[in-house]
From Swiss-Prot:
Function: Catalyzes the ATP-dependent 2-thiolation of cytidine in position 32 of tRNA, to form 2-thiocytidine (s(2)C32). The sulfur atoms are provided by the cysteine/cysteine desulfurase (IscS) system.
SUPFAM superfamilies xref list: Adenine nucleotide alpha hydrolases-like
Residues given in the record as [4Fe-4S] cluster binding sites: 132, 135, 223
Lineage: superkingdom: Bacteria
Cofactor (UniProt): Mg(2+); [4Fe-4S] cluster
Family classification: Belongs to the TtcA family.
Organism: Variovorax paradoxus (strain S110)
One Pfam family here: ATP_bind_3
Anything else known: The thiolation reaction likely consists of two steps: a first activation step by ATP to form an adenylated intermediate of the target base of tRNA, and a second nucleophilic substitution step of the sulfur (S) atom supplied by the hydrosulfide attached to the Fe-S cluster.
Cellular component terms (Gene Ontology): cytoplasm
Gene Ontology molecular functions: 4 iron, 4 sulfur cluster binding; ATP binding; magnesium ion binding; sulfurtransferase activity; tRNA binding
Protein name: tRNA-cytidine(32) 2-sulfurtransferase
Length: 309
């Protein structure tokens, strides 16, 4: 009898690798649910009896937002409804069958709104000029109308942590403002509450989750406007910092939640003109002649690298 020897090492290695991937994916899911849940609680985004209109574009962010919200709804201590909405703007090449098929298979209530805003923008905006302003206004108006028609009490958008930081830098670099994307706001028509449940979520986690879930991603056919080019450049800057300087992006995002108006220059946010010496010592008062100190410097070598980078 001939003996056949089988090397079991590759099989064992594959099994170990599979278990590792499964564990990492489980950790990722827990982190996404935790961060979305924390944002919802911190900003009171969703309340008892809400009907949340989840805007789904076909990109990884909106797919992930819908996915995580459905998971959270299943175990939430309150009741709320979800309806997924896609605005088909009739851009050339948009695969209109993808989202209805996916949402039907998912079993979620959904609505596809067909509006040819693409032709309107092309007709009104001269060739070579930016289309962002008009396109955005048209899209907003349509989605707010649909929210009214569906009886939605909240409109959920899929902007994440990196989008908020990109917007902060775009406003600072090109508009001279310290302004980002709020996690929750009242719409410009005064009738709707808009929420961003992914406010605490890093884009790199959404990329991994989309790969794991195999969402049917619809390629984004951007118009190539200057604003989008600038956003891409700022996004690459943030990714480069994230690669080279551990903790920098997290610290910047934390800074958006720790604003000190008295140490900026906006007189509408702090009464500099009315300041008077009271003669009473303040332990938290500014030490004007001292060099600012950063607690992080004494706590972590990585922070020192962040500041020096």
């Amino acid at each position: 009898m001939n003996a056949v020897w089988i090397d079991e090492a590759p099989v064992a290695g594959a099994a170990t690798n599979s278990l590792k991937i499964e564990r990492e994916t489980h950790k990722l899911e827990k982190r996404l649910c935790r961060e979305v849940g924390r944002a919802i609680v911190d900003y009171n985004m969703i309340e008892e009896g809400d009907k949340v209109m989840v805007c789904v574009s076909g990109g990884k962010d909106s797919y992930a937002m819908l996915d995580i919200l459905l998971k959270l709804r299943a175990r939430a201590p309150i009741h709320f409804d979800i309806v997924a909405v896609n605005l088909d703007q009739k851009q050339p090449g948009f695969p209109e069958e993808v989202l209805p098929r996916y949402l039907s298979e998912l079993g979620v209530d959904f609505h596809i709104e067909n509006q040819d805003t693409y032709s309107i923008v092309k007709r009104v905006i001269p060739e070579g000029k930016t289309t962002c302003g008009l396109c955005s206004r048209l899209r907003r108006g349509i989605l707010y109308r649909v929210a009214d028609e569906l009886g939605a009490t909240k409109v959920a958008l899929g902007h994440h942590r990196d989008d908020m930081l990109q917007t902060f830098f775009l406003n600072m670099f090109f508009a001279g403002k310290l302004k980002s994307m709020p996690p929750k706001l009242v719409s410009d028509d005064g009738k709707h509450i808009v929420i961003r449940p992914l406010a605490y979520v890093a884009e790199k986690d959404l990329v991994r989750w989309a790969q794991h879930r195999e969402f049917p991603i619809i390629p984004c056919t951007l118009c190539g406007s200057q604003e989008n080019l600038q956003r891409k450049q700022v996004g690459e800057m943030l990714r480069e910092w994230d690669r080279k300087h551990l903790g920098r992006v997290e610290n910047m995002f934390t800074a958006l939640q720790n604003v000190v108006p008295s140490h900026l220059l906006d007189g509408t946010q702090h009464d500099f003109k009315g300041l008077k010496a009271t003669g009473v010592a303040d332990e938290d008062g500014d030490k004007a002649f001292d060099t600012p100190s950063f607690d992080l410097l004494s706590q972590a070598p990585a922070a020192l690298r962040i500041l020096q980078g």
